[in-house]
Amino acid sequence: MTNTFMWPFFKTPVPQEPQETAVAEAPLAPALTEVINALPDPALAVDGQGVVVAANAQAAEILEAEPAGRHLSSAIRVPAVLEAVAAAARGEEGASVDYEIRVPVPRSFRAHVSSLGPGKGALLVLRDLTREQQIERMRADFVANASHELRTPLAALSGFLDTIMGAARHDEKAQTKFLGLMRSQADRMRRLIDDLLSLSRIEMNEHLRPSGEVDLVQVAGHVRDVLSGMARDFDCEVVLDGPGSLMVTGSRDELVQVMQNLLENALKYGSSGKRVDITLRRQHDAAELSVRDHGPGIAEEHLPRLTERFYRVNVQESRSRGGTGLGLAIVKHIVNRHRGKLTIVSEPGLGSEFSIRLPLKS
């Protein structure tokens, strides 16, 4: 993509001002830099040739590179934004442009473009709309998903109450049985609401990369110990193999949640009376953690949908084992927030392997 295409005003050279005017305007850049650095939003100043002459720290963070001194098209590859900046640099009226980027995670922005005068350049201020759009989507999703998934346990609770108040009114043994079933349904609703809230929080902050330092080997060992009781219940051996430590950039609490969801799934659905292998290794500039079970495996047609909200390979089995259908969706969004990658490999009869790959701590 050429600069001429992205910046139409290059086709007609900008008239040169007399030397005296150029000298008089020289102090403009330092003044612009002060103004831009004082702005709370990401901001950049672009000269008449499309080169970024000043940018604040927020702009460098969003663009994941220092844009000053580079052509704007190397940092923002959105034709509508570049055309608006080109027009403003020619002295035309400013404009606002909404746009999205998809890599490394989806984000939405509104670019406010203002002219600094004919031939002098333009000021570009970016407003991150990602969070407010996500909040709006999550409100709608939460209501739709919660109402759908809560309908079954609520109907069961209502039925049990009718029985206790009717046919079992004087039957203490039946009342005890139905109260136990009601407790089970209430626990199911609590788990569902907890997972929905957890997923909503993660999605809300997915565009913000965590900055902590986490030992992935320590996280795996901790989760193995926490779930040792569950492993005994399923008569399953959990084997951990890895180096002394693997440091990654991330949130410890979220990575514990990832590890716990993966190991719980392996124990519940894959390895009753068998074994689960947790393997950690360094792969060039990344850390890889895999959880492998030796259970029945998953048919190929299900694999692309496993991380969808509420998608279950076997609905009845999942619900009977206390699953909410949100565990792998939570894993996917946490891994995305950490700029990592989730890989699922499975074949019927040969078990399943869930692997995450995260950047090493630099």
Question: Where would I find each of the regions flagged by the language model?
Answer:
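Conserved catalytic submotifs in the C-terminal HATPase_c
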Residues: 212, 232, 237-246
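Conserved glycine-rich
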Residues: 339-340
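Conserved micro-motifs of the catalytic ATP-binding
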Residues: 204-209, 247-250
